[in-house]
Swiss-Prot record:
Interacts with GBA1. Residues 28-433 are lumenal. PANTHER family: LYSOSOME MEMBRANE PROTEIN 2, SCAVENGER RECEPTOR CLASS B TYPE-1 SR-B1. It comes from Rattus norvegicus. It is a multi-pass membrane protein. Acts as a lysosomal receptor for glucosylceramidase (GBA1) targeting. This is Lysosome membrane protein 2.
């Protein structure tokens, strides 16, 4: 009986250890899990993946921070602007896909993303319909830019004198965000119907969408899950000066493909930034008990480099690191984009304004992604809207102002997975962990039987050494 147990334990130990090593080397269970995820992460009507894509379950909040001008007269005399940050004014962002249509072969799907904003008073510093902000007059600067066209110059100069426009204006937060009717723009609209008589930083963005997208469903390849192939009927942009800079790359930032490696670069096309950007791995994170890869927008995105030369408008007119001239896609308004407080920008932009305090924790854009599923667990998209301003002798409204990039406001669009969704995702991940760890369980059993085999071997050896009483007796007795 003991001999039988001895050989059984040894055989089982050897078989289990060989099997576990074979399974680990061949990655049998890992491949099975990966293939299951790849198969399920496809946009198909009636699936949970499709429902979550069409109506994202995670709450999204957008916080607006304005820079209130405290020394307007001194600025016009050539002094450094002193700005005071006012905010946040927080809105709940409701988003859903609409006009959804599948392509004939099931590999593409078209949709628009409707967004609506609901004010959250308990998360805000005040009432946007009451609170006043003094800021730079962007409509005025826009009209001044139009005056570079000879046939409009005299008309615009006359209008500015007649309406006594000033470089700094005061409006409510609500007006600055969602729009107000501007006197000068209303007059320009008569000559240029394409110019709206209304101005707002997010005018016509509440309850609307930014155009139709065509996405890949992931049917042909999981790496193509929700990747954009067309926006507003175009497969590429036409604002920039090189084909590379005009490319529409990646997803819209709401989702990513599963099975992400920290060595890969992910691409996003945020239409409000007027260009594609990429994000790179930064660190390992844990969100509500779930593992995550943190990806961030690197400083190279807005670097003054040869790779970004195609974003210089006019061609060759490149600004210093940390800012992007997007006037070409903002109806001619002299809008300059940057990260909040000129984070990661050239020091000259920071020192030109009193009140800029850039820091990583509050001003960096990032996204925490579960690498197994590609699901976003936490994220923050942060960027700042500025305007370019300089003294113009023909326009007294500009006074003796310094040439500078002038901050107007910045936003923080954030998302965080809720506990219920995190719990559901955690159960899925735990199940996959059990499956992928089966080889290790088999190996542990092999080690266990190996220990039994060793114990039996040692016990048997001890019994042999000790022997019976007769065996221990001397051969010759006297």
């Amino acid at each position: 009986m003991a001999r039988c147990c001895f050989y059984t334990a040894g055989t089982l130990s050897l078989l289990l250890l060989v099997t576990s090593v074979t399974l680990l080397v061949a990655r049998v269970f890992q491949k099975a899990v990966d293939q299951t995820i790849e198969k399920n992460m496809v946009l198909q009507n009636g699936t949970k993946v499709f429902d979550s894509w069409e109506k994202p379950p995670l709450p999204v909040y957008i916080q607006f921070y304005f820079f209130n001008v405290t020394n307007p007269e001194e600025i016009l005399q050539g002094e450094i602007p002193l700005l005071e940050e006012v905010g946040p004014y927080t809105y709940r962002e409701l988003r859903n896909k609409a006009n959804v249509q599948f392509g004939e072969n099931g590999t593409t799907i078209s949709a628009v993303t409707n967004k609506a904003y609901i004010f959250e008073r308990n998360q805000s510093v005040g009432d946007p319909t009451v609170d006043l902000i003094r800021t730079i007059n962007i409509p005025l600067l826009t009209v001044v830019e139009m005056a570079q066209q000879p046939f409009l110059r005299e008309i615009i100069e006359a209008m500015l004198k007649a309406y006594q426009q000033t470089l700094f204006v005061t409006h409510t937060v609500h007006e600055l965000l969602w729009g107000y009717k501007d006197e000068v723009l209303s007059l320009v609209h008569i000559f240029r119907p394409d110019v709206s008589p209304n101005f707002g930083l997010f005018y016509e963005r509440n309850g609307t969408n930014d155009g139709e997208y065509v996405f890949l469903t992931g049917e042909d390849n999981y790496l193509n899950f929700t990747k954009i192939v067309e926006w507003n009927g175009k497969t590429s942009l036409d604002w920039w000066t090189t084909d590379t800079c005009n490319m529409i790359n990646g997803t819209d930032g709401d989702s990513f493909h599963p099975l992400i490696s920290k060595d890969e670069t992910l691409y996003i096309f945020p239409s409000d930034f007027c260009r594609s950007v990429y994000i790179t791995f930064s660190s390992f994170e844990n969100v509500e008990g779930l593992p995550a890869f943190r990806y961030k927008v690197p400083a190279e995105i807005l670097a003054n480099s040869s790779e970004n030369a195609g974003f210089c408008i006019p061609e060759g007119n490149c600004m210093d690191a940390g800012v992007l001239n997007v006037s070409i896609c903002k109806n001619g308004a002299p809008i300059i984009m940057s990260f909040p407080h000129f984070y990661q920008a050239d020091e000259k932009f920071v020192s030109a304004i009193k009140g800029m305090r850039p820091n990583k924790e509050e001003h960096e854009s990032f996204v925490d992604i579960n690498p197994l599923t590609g699901i976003i667990l936490r994220g923050a998209k942060r960027f700042q809207i500025n305007t370019y301003v300089k003294k113009l002798d023909d326009f007294v409204e500009t006074g003796n102002i310094r040439t500078m990039v002038f901050p107007v406001m910045y936003l923080n669009e954030s998302v965080l997975i809720d506990k219920e969704t995190a719990s559901q995702l955690k159960s899925v991940i735990n199940t996959t962990l059990i499956v992928t760890n089966i080889p290790y369980i088999i190996m542990a059993l092999g080690v266990f039987f190996g220990l039994i085999f060793t114990w039996l071997a040692c016990r048997g050896q001890g019994s042999t050494d000790e022997g019976t009483a007769d065996e221990r007796a001397p051969l010759i007795r006297t």
